[in-house]
Swiss-Prot record:
UniProt cofactor(s): Mn(2+)
Higher taxonomy: Bacteria, Pseudomonadati, Pseudomonadota, Alphaproteobacteria, Hyphomicrobiales
Gene that produces this protein: pcs
Protein name (record): Phosphatidylcholine synthase
Record-annotated disulphide pairs: none
One annotated GO biological process: phospholipid biosynthetic process
Length: 276
């Protein structure tokens, strides 16, 4: 009996020790909450699929817009909380890529096919081009440049298809846009990241926010937007589409302002370090 009791106590001690060792810390809980925020994009994607299946495209784009907002804020929060180092066994990058493929690629391709505004055949072919080319693009580990530009069209099909839904160009113009963008995914041409690219950041971010504003107005009109909205979203969209290549051709464009800002930041950090 004594031996059994000692064995039971030993097992209990080991289990208690393991449970104590696995105690969740406050930083870990905060870090995991960021992963939950990122994962919420999958539910938003589900809601957008349901809406698209019912032909409620305005609702679908609202859900995808909310998913885009979540995708825009989870990264900065994750870096601030150092999630990658606090929870090294959980890959925020992989989770983000999975949800991005669904919200940026798969659902817009489905909506393009489901709506049929390019005609049945062209819509089907366009959807196939989008999902296959994007899957290959996501496998590229060198999709970012040193300046945080995307190398090649960054498969932001949610923005492209959304613009097509609002502007409603001819079916062959829309099809040509899809084909050209898919080809550009694999060419060494820079595309803008409106937040992470330092050069011309104030201007680029302003144009991006204007594009978002025109998009919200278009959704208010249930995608049947007036001409000024269609012109606005087209002009801002074309700027976002081409400015990366223009800045690649003219590498000095906006560089002085970016360097001056970097110098001020370094000086501020140095002064902060010298403070008692």
């Amino acid at each position: 009996m004594g031996g059994q009791k000692e064995m039971a106590d030993s097992v209990k001690t080991k289990l208690t020790g393991k449970l104590k060792a696995k105690k969740v810390t406050a930083p870990q809980a905060k870090a995991f909450s960021v992963h939950l925020l990122t994962a919420s994009g999958s539910f938003l994607a589900f809601l957008s699929v349901v809406a698209a299946s019912d032909g409620r495209y305005t609702a679908m784009w609202w859900w995808l817009g909310l998913a885009l907002f979540v995708d825009g804020i989870d990264g900065p929060i994750a870096r601030k909380l150092e999630v990658k180092y606090v929870l090294p066994n959980w890959s925020g990058e992989l989770l983000d890529s999975i949800i991005d493929y669904v919200t940026y690629v798969l659902i817009p391709a489905f909506a393009l096919y489901q709506s049929g505004f390019m005609g049945t055949n062209l819509s089907f072919i366009s959807g196939a081009i989008i999902v296959v080319s994007s899957a290959i693009y996501y496998a590229d580990t060198g999709m970012k440049t040193k300046e945080n530009f995307f190398k090649g069209f960054p498969v932001v099909w949610n923005m492209v298809v959304f613009t097509l839904f609002i502007v409603r160009p001819g079916e062959w113009v829309a099809f040509g846009t899809v084909v050209a963008s898919a080809i550009l995914s694999f060419l060494p041409i820079n595309f803008l990241h409106p937040v992470r690219v330092v050069r011309l950041r104030p201007l680029n971010l302003t144009i991006f926010l204007l594009w978002c504003a025109f998009g919200v107005i278009a959704l208010y009109y249930m995608l049947d937007a007036p001409l000024w909205v269609r012109i606005g979203i087209s002009v801002t969209g074309l700027y976002i589409y081409f400015i990366g290549a223009i800045m690649q051709l003219f590498p000095s464009l906006g560089r002085e302002a970016a360097l001056a800002k970097a110098r001020k930041l370094v000086e501020k950090q140095q002064k902060s370090g010298e403070a008692p």
